[in-house]
Amino acid sequence: MSTEFEQAVAALHGEGVIAYATEAVFGLGCDPDSELAVQRLLAIKQRPVEKGLILIAADLVQLQDYIDLSQLSGEQLARVEASWPGPFTWIMPARATTPTWLTGQFDTLAVRVTAHPQVQALCRAFGKPLVSTSANLTGEEPARRVTDIGELLASKLAYILPGEVGGQANPSEIKDARTGAVIRPS
């Protein structure tokens, strides 16, 4: 593991918020199991907890502690799995044990299995998914390069992992896993 990855993982274990490249934009991430880390991320983003968050993972196995796959039919799960890894976020039933700092006011959770090699490696090195949201203040344009991360935002982060965004022009499409309805087009 590179020193950069070690620093990013250490920041995550220290309940910090990091920035890292995803398929389309730089993301802000933290430990989904740390309420303190999530509250820090929400404060940086100026985002209300009620809106809920997205988890990004290296594979479906990393998400199984947070989502209730038993509430999906075989066909629904097959549709989700056919889109991954990739820039597709699915709203899925949350487990009863999934904290409200992740789900917000919902009984569901937005999840994605990334195709971005650096994010896959980061999730594997950390051993679980990350909370993932775009690296910007709510309402502003998301960062597409490290240099786009403003000084104000950068000063609030525990670490910025150098990297390149993937080839996606827009943030991930969000769909409801049970209905197939598009919540946010790509």
Curated annotation (Swiss-Prot):
Superkingdom? Bacteria
Q: Which InterPro entries match?
A: DHBP_synth_RibB-like_a/b_dom (IPR017945), Sua5-like_dom (IPR006070), TC-AMP_synthase (IPR023535), TC-AMP_synthase_SUA5 (IPR050156)
List, in alphabetical order, the Gene Ontology terms for molecular function in this entry. ATP binding; double-stranded RNA binding; L-threonylcarbamoyladenylate synthase; tRNA binding
Keyword set, alphabetical order: ATP-binding, Cytoplasm, Nucleotide-binding, Nucleotidyltransferase, Transferase, tRNA processing
Q: Where in the cell is it found?
A: Cytoplasm
What broad class of enzyme is this? transferase
Single biological process term from Gene Ontology = tRNA threonylcarbamoyladenosine modification
- Entry's Pfam families? Sua5_yciO_yrdC
Note whether Kinase occurs among the keywords: no
PROSITE patterns found in the cross-reference section: YRDC
| Coiled coil regions in record | none
UniProt-listed Enzyme Commission number(s): 2.7.7.87
Q: Which HAMAP family match?
A: TsaC (MF_01852)
Role description: Required for the formation of a threonylcarbamoyl group on adenosine at position 37 (t(6)A37) in tRNAs that read codons beginning with adenine. Catalyzes the conversion of L-threonine, HCO(3)(-)/CO(2) and ATP to give threonylcarbamoyl-AMP (TC-AMP) as the acyladenylate intermediate, with the release of diphosphate.
Query: Per the similarity annotation, which family is this?
Result: Belongs to the SUA5 family. TsaC subfamily.
Q: What is this protein called?
A: Threonylcarbamoyl-AMP synthase
Q: Which organism is it from?
A: Aeromonas salmonicida (strain A449)
**Source species taxonomy:** Bacteria, Pseudomonadati, Pseudomonadota, Gammaproteobacteria, Aeromonadales
